[in-house]
Regions:
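TRNA-recognition modules of translation machinery and tRNA-sensing kinases, especially anticodon-binding
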Residues: 26, 129-423
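N-terminal alpha-helical targeting/anchoring segments
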Residues: 1-134, 152, 156
Length: 423
């Protein structure tokens, strides 16, 4: 969530920066300014009313002590009237404050200066490209055909049990899935991330804190009986560990990693891009989260990008790194790098990770702060990234390692799978 100060200090700059994300912010900022001015005016009136009320209340006892009962009764009536007015002002203050908050949360985060201009994924900037490591057979099979051939993923059984987008992993497929999760977690913990195992259901405050609510409410599974949400990413519960927390400067950086199943409704998704593992309602993902001092958050982002790249490299997959344009960025992000691996069988790139700096946007919602060397309280910066999302990694591993004799397992994974070939 942006702060009022960010929006009011340089209105035109705020409008210009949000336009890069395709948002016409001028009408919203105008409304925010009006509501902010109204709130300040109500606060001023309320403070004056309470001061007068307190002064009048003090006078009642003195008047009674002097035997001036009629004047004391008049003061009591005045205090009662002032109390009624202060209650009305309090109610109005809350109403205006709620309206102000509702207006502010409609605005996305400012994109960083180096974010490319653009509206769609076609405008993203490729910052690195690494070609294929392996020679594939002619006419390679897509992963959904390989899954059927080797009986390692059953999409039809998932439909029977739940519905489309809920595959069942079997045999070597299930072991590969477990191996990847453990490999990713081990890579992360070796890099200094503390492993945590969070709940996969969160409350509304957690969803709001990281920015999924209200922006992505329609994409989240909602258990209405208890008003809990299934997590779309471990980012939500892990970052919310520090909601309403004030850290010391010496506590940074805070580095955490977690594996969770993730749940997304993906409403409106259809067509060839959703076949097989390309787009699921339930999938496994390992996440890394960092909390950083503001002046060090972009250095932290570079480190996270390098870390995710080291994992993709270890799997020996063809990949590229993109810097997302303003129109393709998330609501909460200030700067995002996407990792994509190439599917030769599908002739397309598959996203397997997004690594983002949110600056203070999430921290402002979370009330995640720290005390600096001067003991002043400031907002921290938050970052996160997938390291990695499994479905498309599995798809790419199957497709890029297929041979006439089976599917090779990358060397780095063999200690985790216990086998070197899917047959």
């Amino acid at each position: 969530m942006l702060t009022i100060k960010q929006l009011r200090d340089d209105r035109e700059a705020a409008i210009r920066r949000l336009a890069k994300k395709g948002v016409d912010a001028a009408p919203v900022i105008t409304e925010i300014e009006k509501l902010d001015d109204r709130r300040k005016a109500i606060q001023h009136d309320l403070d004056e009313c309470l001061a007068t009320q307190n002064q009048a209340a003090k006078q009642i006892g003195a008047l009674m002590g002097q035997g001036r009962r009629d004047e004391a009764e008049a003061k009591k009536a005045e205090v009662a009237s002032l109390k009624e007015r202060s209650n009305a002002l309090n109610a109005e203050f809350k109403e205006v404050s709620d309206a102000l908050q509702a207006a502010i949360v409609t605005l996305p985060n400012f994109p960083a200066d180096i974010v490319p201009e653009g509206k769609t994924a076609e405008d993203n900037l490729v910052v690195k490209l690494v070609e294929s490591y392996t020679q594939l057979p002619e006419n390679p099979l897509p992963h959904w055909e390989l899954a059927r051939k080797y009986d390692i993923i059953d999409f039809d059984l998932g439909v029977k049990l739940t519905g489309a987008g809920f595959p069942v992993y079997k045999g070597q497929g299930a072991r590969l899935q477990r191996a990847l999760i453990n490999f990713f977690l081990d890579c992360n913990t070796r890099a200094g991330y503390l492993e945590v195992e969070p709940p996969v259901m969160v409350n509304e405050a957690s969803g709001f804190g990281t920015g999924q609510l209200p922006d992505k409410e329609g994409q989240m599974y909602h258990a209405t009986a208890d008003n809990f949400y299934l997590v779309p990413t471990a980012e939500v519960p892990v970052t919310n560990i520090y909601r309403d927390v004030i850290l010391d400067e010496k506590d940074f950086p805070v580095k955490m990693t977690a594996y969770t199943p993730c749940f997304r409704r993906e409403a409106g998704s259809y067509g060839k891009d959703v076949r097989g593992l390309n787009r699921l309602h339930q999938f496994d993902k390992v996440e890394i989260v960092q909390l950083s001092l503001p002046e060090k958050s972009y250095e932290a982002l570079d480190g996270m990008v390098a870390h995710v790249e080291s994992i993709v490299k270890a799997l020996k997959l063809p990949y590229r790194i993109l810097r997302l344009c303003g129109g393709d960025m998330s609501f909460t992000s200030a700067l995002t790098y996407d990792f994509e691996v190439y599917s030769e069988a599908q002739k397309r790139w598959l996203e397997v990770s997004s690594v983002s700096n949110f600056e203070s946007f999430q921290a402002n919602r979370l009330k995640l702060r720290y005390k600096d060397a001067d003991k002043k309280t400031r907002l921290a910066h938050t970052l996160n990234g997938s390291s990695l999302a499994l479905p498309r990694i599995v798809a790419a591993l199957l497709e890029n390692n297929q041979t006439p004799d089976g599917i090779r397992i990358p060397e780095a994974l063999i200690p985790y799978t216990g086998f070197d070939m899917i047959k």
